[in-house]
């Protein structure tokens, strides 16, 4: 959530920054400012009426001591109380509406974020690894998986509908090996592993920014008023909801493996075939809770930690800086890591590493006490390390052989016996 104080103090800066994402956000800021002015006016009026009520109450006390009639003053106080009550109801409505508007305003962008309209304007930062060359006709991961009897899309569809899959035997073991490998590398890099709930309260998703804006993307359990998590970022960040940390506790580094659940409501017709875009998929997540002064150094560290996984797996990838029109709602700056997918002859996203600055911390009330004793909001960062299903896709396609086998990356030999599956 953007600070209302910042909007009040420097509205033009806020509007210009948000306009890099969407010109129409300027109007929302104007609406918030009008409501804020109305709110402050009503607060002032309530305070004045309370002062008047108190003064008249004292006057009544004085008159009663003198044995004088106080009926007219008592009627005035009754009317004042009615007006205060009415104003307080109006104030509560204004504050609720203002909060609703603020919760739908995205984060401010860091000055280094490139301007652009969509993913075509993202800026490539680096490439790593050699793109493999094949002397045979390659298969995409879906066809290869079905051919080998490792993936069953038809039965998954019969069980659950479209965009689900069943992994079998060696491929299921390879996915499990990847999860363990990723968690162990993350632990080596100083992240504490956690096992977190997969069902969360609505307010938990408000804290990380998925609600209220992206409700249609989420699976909701109505009877229990709980949502299935779209990413482990949600419970990991909220571990410190309504908490005041010690400055010396920072940074806090967390990692978790979870299945993730997304309705993909806006993805009709995209990646219909295969494992790239599923309603349920495995992901290993990284979250950092850090001091505001070091959050951009921590973003580079987060990116490096996610890259290390791909480097150890010897999978070619590139890093892009997301432009203003493609960056996520809660992020101030984001790097995407895109892995090479031979069958598509292009790089595809496998991780997003974002600095949300204090945007999530304000929504989830996450603070730390600095050395002067002042409570300040922390900065939060998150990144995939990695999307397991897409990593599996990349291995299947980049490591495939002429006889339709899949070679095992060297670093996974401790997890899976043999050269190929």
Swiss-Prot record:
GO terms for biological process: selenocysteine biosynthetic process; seryl-tRNA aminoacylation. The keyword Cytoplasm applies. ATP binds at residues 262-264, 349-352. InterPro entries: aa-tRNA-synt_IIb, aa-tRNA-synth_II, aa-tRNA-synth_II/BPL/LPL, Ser-tRNA-ligase_type_1, Ser-tRNA-synth_1_N, SerRS_1_N_sf, SerRS_core, tRNA-bd_arm. Pathway: Aminoacyl-tRNA biosynthesis; selenocysteinyl-tRNA(Sec) biosynthesis; L-seryl-tRNA(Sec) from L-serine and tRNA(Sec): step 1/1. Transmembrane segments: none annotated. Its EC number is 6.1.1.11. It is found in: Cytoplasm. The keyword Zinc does not apply. PANTHER family: SERINE--TRNA LIGASE (PTHR43697:SF1), SERYL-TRNA SYNTHETASE (PTHR43697). Catalyzes the attachment of serine to tRNA(Ser). Is also able to aminoacylate tRNA(Sec) with serine, to form the misacylated tRNA L-seryl-tRNA(Sec), which will be further converted into selenocysteinyl-tRNA(Sec). Consists of two distinct domains, a catalytic core and a N-terminal extension that is involved in tRNA binding. Belongs to the class-II aminoacyl-tRNA synthetase family. Type-1 seryl-tRNA synthetase subfamily. This is Serine--tRNA ligase. It comes from Hydrogenobaculum sp. (strain Y04AAS1).
């Amino acid at each position: 959530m953007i600070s209302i104080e910042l909007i009040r103090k420097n509205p033009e800066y806020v509007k210009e920054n948000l306009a890099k994402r969407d010109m129409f956000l300027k109007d929302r800021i104007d609406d918030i400012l009008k409501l804020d002015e109305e709110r402050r006016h009503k607060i002032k009026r309530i305070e004045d009426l309370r002062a008047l009520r108190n003064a008249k109450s004292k006057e009544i006390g004085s008159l009663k001591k003198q044995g004088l009639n106080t009926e007219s003053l008592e009627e005035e106080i009754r009317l004042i109380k009615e007006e205060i009550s009415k104003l307080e109801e109006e104030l509560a409505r204004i504050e609720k509406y203002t909060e609703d508007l603020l919760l739908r305003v995205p984060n401010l962008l860091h000055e280094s974020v490139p301007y652009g309209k969509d993913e075509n304007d993202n800026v490539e930062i680096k490439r790593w690894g050699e793109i493999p060359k094949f002397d045979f006709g390659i298969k995409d991961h879906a066809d290869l998986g079905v051919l080998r009897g490792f993936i069953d899309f038809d039965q998954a569809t019969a069980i659950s509908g479209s965009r689900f899959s069943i992994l079998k035997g060696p491929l299921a073991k390879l996915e499990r090996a990847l999860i363990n490998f990723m968690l162990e590398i993350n632990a080596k890099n100083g992240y504490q592993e956690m096992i977190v709930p997969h069902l969360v309260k609505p307010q938990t998703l408000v804290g990380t920014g998925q609600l209220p804006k992206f409700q249609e993307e989420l699976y909701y359990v109505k009877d229990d008023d709980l949502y299935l998590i779209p990413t482990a970022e949600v419970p990991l960040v909220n571990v410190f909801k309504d908490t005041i940390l010690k400055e010396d506790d920072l940074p806090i580094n967390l990692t978790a493996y979870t299945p993730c659940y997304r309705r993909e409501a806006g993805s009709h017709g995209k990646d219909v075939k295969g494992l790239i875009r599923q309603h349920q998929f495995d992901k290993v997540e990284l979250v950092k809770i850090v001091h505001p002064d070091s959050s951009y150094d921590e973003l580079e560290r987060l990116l490096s930690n996610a890259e290390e996984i791909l480097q150890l797996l010897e999978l070619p990838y590139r890093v892009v800086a997301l432009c203003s029109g493609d960056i996520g709602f809660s992020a101030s700056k984001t790097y995407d890591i895109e892995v090479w997918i031979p069958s598509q002859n292009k790089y595809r996203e496998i991780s997003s590493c974002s600095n949300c600055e204090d945007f999530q911390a304000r929504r989830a009330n996450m603070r730390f006490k600095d050395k002067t004793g002042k409570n300040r909001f922390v900065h939060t960062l998150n990144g995939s390390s990695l999307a397991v299903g897409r990593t599996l896709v990349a291995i299947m396609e980049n490591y495939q052989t002429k006889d339709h086998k899949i070679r095992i990356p060297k670093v996974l030999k401790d997890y899976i016996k043999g050269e190929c599956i």
